[in-house]
């Protein structure tokens, strides 16, 4: 039961941080792609790799911070929604491919770099 509580509290914290950062980035940066989600996901991916690399043996901390906080911070559902917007109602190939590549490839590389540090 304590595991669920750690994940729930961490997830709430991460979601609030994501909402706040999204508002900050949207008010300060104009971009043809959803830059707020990109930044949040890339930073989150890096931090997931970094924390996983140093905290594998600390189950409660990993559940709270990786699964909870960073899971709440990063967002696959918003990413999916934003990618669908590039193909509907009219296909925007440059935004679609650049955003997809940045999110998935650079996201993986960010996580790997974080883990390798």
From Swiss-Prot:
Principal cellular location given in the protein's record: membrane
Transmembrane domains' residue ranges: 1-21, 35-55, 60-80, 97-117
Reaction equation(s) it catalyzes: fluoride(in) = fluoride(out)
InterPro entries (alphabetical): FluC
GO terms for MF: fluoride channel activity; metal ion binding
Residues bound to Na(+): 71, 74
Gene Ontology terms: biological process: cellular detoxification of fluoride
Record's bilayer topology term: Multi-pass membrane protein
Record keywords: Cell membrane, Ion channel, Ion transport, Membrane, Metal-binding, Sodium, Transmembrane, Transmembrane helix, Transport
Pfam families referenced in this protein's UniProt entry, alphabetically: CRCB
Record's subcellular location: Cell membrane
Activity regulation comment: Na(+) is not transported, but it plays an essential structural role and its presence is essential for fluoride channel function.
GO CC, alphabetical: plasma membrane
Family: Belongs to the fluoride channel Fluc/FEX (TC 1.A.43) family.
Function text: Fluoride-specific ion channel. Important for reducing fluoride concentration in the cell, thus reducing its toxicity.
Name used for this protein in its record: Fluoride-specific ion channel FluC 1
Source species of the chain: Staphylococcus haemolyticus (strain JCSC1435)
């Amino acid at each position: 039961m304590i595991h669920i509580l750690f994940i729930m509290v961490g997830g709430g914290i991460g979601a609030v941080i994501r909402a706040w950062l999204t508002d900050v980035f949207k008010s300060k940066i104009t971009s043809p792609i959803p830059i707020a989600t990109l930044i949040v996901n890339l930073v989150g991916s890096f931090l997931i790799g970094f924390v996983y690399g140093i905290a594998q043996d600390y189950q409660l901390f990993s559940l709270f911070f990786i699964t909870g906080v960073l899971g709440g911070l990063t967002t696959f559902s918003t990413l999916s929604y934003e990618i669908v917007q590039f193909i509907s109602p009219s296909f925007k190939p440059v935004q679609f491919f650049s955003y997809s590549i940045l999110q998935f490839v650079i996201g993986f590389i960010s996580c790997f770099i974080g883990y390798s540090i």
